[in-house]
């Protein structure tokens, strides 16, 4: 076992007592005056956008977000370094905790001079406790608390001497890897106690305040389960000057990662909504804590999605001849064939390429749209995402690539009783390790804020606030139901199903 403790002392910024009360009268930038402005007063004067300053740089209590106030009173730690607005919170005892245990057991049995077996069982367990923001032990913590990795499996091996010149070796193995990253303290927390009503789950939303320490995790963490089963067979035959080796290998790999993004919500607050001019980046106005107290995030989102349940097979065959040409010269000749089977997903939650040759469902509308005559590409609009196992599309992510032959050659020459020169050449193919995009099966609902640039309509900024960030609810992943119209008008990604193994 291993026990390791690594110090991670942190000094960061947290809102001051005055800022938590909406009082920014003592805030200065570069020694000069500083002001916060009311975003609901945005108007045009003399061709420029202007806002009215909050009197005395204080936000009225009636304008403050109840959720933001609860965050600042119940979640954000108070400063512990006096008389400082910046670098006013220190955690000198913040440390990473790493615990690792490993067990290995092996049993050998010899049946006879020509047959023997062994079996091995192994297991290891690792816990990592590490805080990224120095708030370990609280619901505001970010980081691994804990991140747990478990790995266990076994091997069975049989060696049989078939004759004085022939040996057969068979081996089977299985490995299971589990990884979780859940915040134990956050699991005890109910986000509804802060005033949230629409957000699913109990995990605290992730909140970023520009120039301040960030809090919360925004999701229920990561949960991954990977299983690998394998079988190998090797046969060695010696005759004359030759040592021939034949063999093969088969693996079945199953990977089940669960990552759903910010399923409890992510909110980012900047100076934008409390600046003097929304179109101007000046250093003497606007404050992220002021924007937070007003309940106006610059951007936010909430995610929803499903896990993966992927599987693929790997096979290989090889032959090798160690030929002793002379007493001093040995030549190794070999050939290996690898086949990485196409990846599939248990419920076909994969994008499989792009329909370059299929007419878009929007083709008629685009062809008849005003100005289409000046758009050559509009005359015959094609394309859209294709989904595994839908509409006759193959379930696999890639087409099979079965021509991965790899020649090998090596030389060993004995120059003297103390010197041997060796050289060789080999061609190798790399595993792709591609899981493919899940467009349509994961979706992020964006926060629709007021007009950040201060154009007409800015007074409607108060409609969507911290209290009601997603009035239409969280979007539901459509899966493959939209067909070629999936993510239309947005950026998309896909893997070429005819890709070549590098």
Question: Predicted regions: what is each one?
Answer:
Residues 1-502:
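Short acidic-glycine motifs
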């Amino acid at each position: 076992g291993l026990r390791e403790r690594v110090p991670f002392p942190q000094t960061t910024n947290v809102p001051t007592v005055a800022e938590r009360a909406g009082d920014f009268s003592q805030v200065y930038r570069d020694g000069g005056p500083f002001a916060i402005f009311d975003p609901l007063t945005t108007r045009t004067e003399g061709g420029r956008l202007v806002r009215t300053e909050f009197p005395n740089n204080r936000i009225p209590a009636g304008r403050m977000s109840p959720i933001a106030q609860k965050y600042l009173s119940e979640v954000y730690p108070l400063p512990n370094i006096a008389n400082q607005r910046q670098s006013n919170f220190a955690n000198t005892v913040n440390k990473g905790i790493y615990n690792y245990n490993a067990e290995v057991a092996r049993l050998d049995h010899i049946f006879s001079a020509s047959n023997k077996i062994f079996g091995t069982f192994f297991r290891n367990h690792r816990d990592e406790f590490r805080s990224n923001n120095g708030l370990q032990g609280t619901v505001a913590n970010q980081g691994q608390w804990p991140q747990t990795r478990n790995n266990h499996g076994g091997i069975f091996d049989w060696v049989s001497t078939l004759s004085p010149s022939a040996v057969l070796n068979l081996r089977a193995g299985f490995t299971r890897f589990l990884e979780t990253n859940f915040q134990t303290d956050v699991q005890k927390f109910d986000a509804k106690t802060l005033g949230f009503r629409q957000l699913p789950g109990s995990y605290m939303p992730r909140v970023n305040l520009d120039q301040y320490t960030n809090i919360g995790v925004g999701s229920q963490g990561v949960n991954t389960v990977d299983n690998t089963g394998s079988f190998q067979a090797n046969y060695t035959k010696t005759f004359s000057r030759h040592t021939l080796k034949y063999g093969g290998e088969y693996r079945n790999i199953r990977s089940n990662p669960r990552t759903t993004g910010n399923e409890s919500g992510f909110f980012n607050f900047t100076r934008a909504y409390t600046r003097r001019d929304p179109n101007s980046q000046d250093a003497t106005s606007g404050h992220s804590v002021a924007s937070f107290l007003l309940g106006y995030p610059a951007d936010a989102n909430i995610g929803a999605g499903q896990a993966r349940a992927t599987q693929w097979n790997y096979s290989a065959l090889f032959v090798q001849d160690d030929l002793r040409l002379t007493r001093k010269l040995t030549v190794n000749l070999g050939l290996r064939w690898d086949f990485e089977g196409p990846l599939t997903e248990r419920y076909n939650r994969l994008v499989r390429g792009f329909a370059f040759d299929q007419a878009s469902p929007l083709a008629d509308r685009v062809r008849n749209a005003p100005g289409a005559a000046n758009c050559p590409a509009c005359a015959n609009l094609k394309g859209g995402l294709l989904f595994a196992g839908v509409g006759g599309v193959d379930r696999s992510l890639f087409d099979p690539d079965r021509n991965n032959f790899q020649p090998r050659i090596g030389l060993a020459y004995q120059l003297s009783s103390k010197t041997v020169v060796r050289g060789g050449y080999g061609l190798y193919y790399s595993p792709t390790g591609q899981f493919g995009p899940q467009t349509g099966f994961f979706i992020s609902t964006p926060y629709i804020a007021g007009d950040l640039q201060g154009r007409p309509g800015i007074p409607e900024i108060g409609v969507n606030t911290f209290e009601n960030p997603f009035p239409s609810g969280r979007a539901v992943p459509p899966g493959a139901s939209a067909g070629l119209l999936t993510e239309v008008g947005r950026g998309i990604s896909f893997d070429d199903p005819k890709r070549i193994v590098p």
